[in-house]
């Protein structure tokens, strides 16, 4: 072959490679982790276990999204219904683990080979320090309390492989105790937190920070695409270093991070069927949390949503007592333009001006002793009063008569979310259910019934549950919404660490 022939052959080879390989500008700095999705499983989900006719004390009982101390949001997390997982490696050579990539926490932990007395450890992959040439001993004790379980162990250091990246000298927790059923039935081995270092247990530097420090990503941005259209197989993708335009439609709406720790931002009004609930008209805090499968919000609003979608609820005797004994008095105070947050204290149902005397105990679960609080469950009459004020205020804004308002609030007393965290709905009624809209960055983000109703099982045995669950965070951190996978599925989500902002766009 002559020189010209060789040149032509090389040119043809280059052109062929360009057709089969992505352009360097597209692939450079982007690390893709495929996510697997599993359907919600009747055996592992938290069942309601209650019929709509049962009377329950308001906010009492075993709510899986609430810790005994009413403490940090991490301590409220419920991984029982987790659906999206990815694979990482720890050590050299890499030992494989399936993890939840969780923007609502900041630590990496995996089961340890030295976990001898927890059955959960024997059902999952376990880290063997002696099998890794890059292991470094640390030994500092660590523990994390979640809403539906806990882990304890100690810190170690090793290389962590995420996609094609190798993060060196990463601190992580070797879990030697995994009590309870949560991690026993879990389909994942551990959790990789993508929150801020401010909430990291033991002040360990999160994996994401190490990626940036070691120059492993070109841009300090990661993004989530959760595929909600499949039951199994391709569940989506998390991309470190940027985003893939194929995963979203249009432009992202960005909002600034308002408080580092969680990916927290300010959210505006919540609308049900196009009508304001009034609860967040003046603004609410929200966090984008990939480690939460449902969408959690204040009980007062979740109850209104339940009523509109026909979700089975539980009857609250405290709520009904408020309506019958204090309803007219509350209405009169609202009509007299009394400051709403002061009403429940004026009628003698709350200790302070609309607060419950709860400590500001929303904090990181680090090395401190748990913060004790008299919390929401200690004063159900105060909680019921505060909800009634919200409901009545909203109805007055719609110019409803006093009789209609009292009747409506009494109906809501029959629709309170189950203490077990889930509410069943009629699978055949999706067509009559309203859209639920969240105002973010001045734009409305709607969830359609088929997006917020989750189907469990198939055929005649199928059940449908609401994707909304109640969770009350007291001031100063709350009221707070947690936008989990129910929201992040329909909306591609960008976590921009460099500019401290979060972006949402319609998922492709």
UniProtKB/Swiss-Prot annotation:
SUPFAM superfamilies: Acid proteases (SSF50630), Saposin (SSF47862). Embryo and leaf. It comes from Hordeum vulgare. GO terms for cellular component: vacuole. Residues 314-419 form the Saposin B-type domain. PANTHER family: ASPARTIC PROTEINASE A1, BETA-SITE APP-CLEAVING ENZYME, ISOFORM A-RELATED. Belongs to the peptidase A1 family. One of its GO terms (biological process) is proteolysis. Residues 84-505 form the Peptidase A1 domain. The keyword Disulfide bond applies. Disulfide bonds join 115-121, 280-284, 319-413, 344-385, 350-382, 427-464. PROSITE patterns: ASP_PROTEASE, PEPTIDASE_A1, SAP_B. Residues 1-27 form the signal peptide. It catalyses: Prefers hydrophobic residues Phe, Val, Ile, Leu, and Ala at P1 and P1', but also cleaves -Phe-|-Asp- and -Asp-|-Asp- bonds in 2S albumin from plant seeds. The active site is at residues 102, 289. Heterodimer of two subunits (29 kDa and 11 kDa) processed from the precursor molecule. A large enzyme (32 kDa and 16 kDa) is an intermediate precursor form. Glycans are attached at residue 399. The record marks 377-378, 421-422 as: Cleavage. Its EC number is 3.4.23.40. One of its GO terms (molecular function) is aspartic-type endopeptidase activity. Involved in the breakdown of propeptides of storage proteins in protein-storage vacuoles. Residues 28-66 form a propeptide. The keyword Protease applies. It is found in: Vacuole. This is Phytepsin. Its main location: other. Keywords: Aspartyl protease, Disulfide bond, Glycoprotein, Hydrolase, Protease, Signal, Vacuole, Zymogen.
């Amino acid at each position: 072959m002559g020189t010209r022939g060789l040149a032509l052959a090389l040119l043809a080879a280059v052109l062929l490679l360009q057709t089969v390989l992505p352009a360097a500008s597209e692939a450079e700095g982007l690390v893709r982790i495929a996510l697997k999705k599993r359907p919600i499983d009747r055996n592992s989900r938290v069942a309601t276990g209650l019929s709509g006719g049962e009377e329950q004390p308001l906010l009492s009982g075993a709510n899986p999204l609430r810790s005994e101390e009413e403490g940090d949001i991490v301590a409220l997390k419920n991984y029982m219904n987790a659906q999206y997982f990815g694979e990482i490696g720890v050590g050299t050579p890499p030992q494989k683990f399936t993890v939840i990539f969780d923007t609502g926490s900041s630590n990496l932990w995996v089961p340890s080979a030295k976990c001898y007395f927890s059955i959960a450890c024997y059902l999952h992959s376990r880290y063997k320090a002696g099998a890794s040439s890059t292991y470094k001993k640390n030994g500092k004790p660590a523990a994390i309390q979640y809403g539906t379980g806990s882990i304890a162990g100690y810190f170690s250091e090793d290389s962590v492989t995420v996609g094609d990246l190798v993060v060196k000298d990463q601190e992580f927790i070797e879990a030697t105790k995994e009590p309870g059923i949560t991690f026993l039935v879990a389909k994942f081995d551990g959790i990789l937190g993508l929150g801020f270092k401010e909430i990291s247990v033991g002040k360990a530097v999160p994996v994401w920070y190490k990626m940036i420090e070691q120059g492993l990503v070109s841009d300090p941005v990661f993004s989530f695409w959760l595929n909600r259209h499949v039951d199994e197989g391709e569940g989506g993708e998390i991309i470190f270093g940027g985003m893939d335009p194929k995963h979203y439609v249009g432009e992202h709406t960005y909002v600034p991070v308002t408080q580092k720790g969680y990916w927290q931002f300010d959210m505006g009004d919540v609308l049900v069927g196009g009508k304001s609930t009034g609860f967040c008209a003046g603004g609410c805090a929200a966090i984008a949390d990939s480690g939460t499968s449902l969408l959690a919000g204040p009980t007062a609003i979740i109850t209104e949503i339940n009523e509109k979608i026909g979700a089975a609820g539980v009857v609250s005797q405290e709520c009904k007592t408020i309506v019958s004994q204090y309803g007219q008095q509350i209405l009169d105070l609202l009509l007299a333009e009394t400051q709403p947050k002061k009403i429940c204290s004026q009628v003698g149902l709350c200790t302070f001006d609309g607060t419950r005397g709860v400590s500001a105990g929303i904090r990181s679960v680090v090395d401190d002793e748990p913060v004790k609080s008299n919390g929401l469950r200690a004063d159900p009459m105060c909680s019921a009063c505060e909800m009634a004020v919200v409901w009545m205020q909203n109805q007055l804004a719609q110019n409803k008569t006093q009789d209609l308002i009292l009747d409506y609030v009494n109906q809501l007393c029959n629709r309170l979310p189950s203490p077990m965290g889930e509410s069943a709905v009629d699978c055949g009624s999706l067509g009559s259910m309203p859209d639920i809209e969240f105002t973010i960055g001045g734009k409305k983000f709607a969830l359609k019934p088929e997006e917020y109703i989750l189907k469990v099982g198939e055929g005649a045995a199928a059940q449908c549950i609401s994707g909304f669950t109640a969770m009350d965070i007291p001031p100063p951190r709350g009221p707070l919404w947690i936008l989990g996978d129910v929201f992040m599925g329909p909306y591609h989500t960008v976590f921009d660490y460099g500019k401290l902002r979060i972006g949402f766009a319609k998922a492709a």
